[in-house]
Amino acid sequence: IFVDSKAQKTDGYQLSKAILLDETSEFNAKPELEIYADDVKCSHGSASGSLNEDSIFYLMSRGLNYHQSKELLINGFLLDVVEKITDNEIRNLIKNIIGLKE
């Protein structure tokens, strides 16, 4: 987050999220907030964890296998971010690169 000295009354939040897919996975969050204004509300947060086994169990009880369940949860996590990209060309390019349907 960058807040110029003229950007008073700015409200900003930076969030880093990650899914840890195996025992060797690591997630290093490094928030970067450059704030040059006095009257602002800016903060940051970080969250990480493995896939929810209850969610995998639920999807498997609905007919998906373990791999399909895991893939569906990961794609949902990725789509949450990708869908916020406003440029259609860039959004579709990223979807194509990570194998998500348009």
What are these regions (language model features)?
Residues I1-E102:
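Active-site gating/interface segments in enzymes
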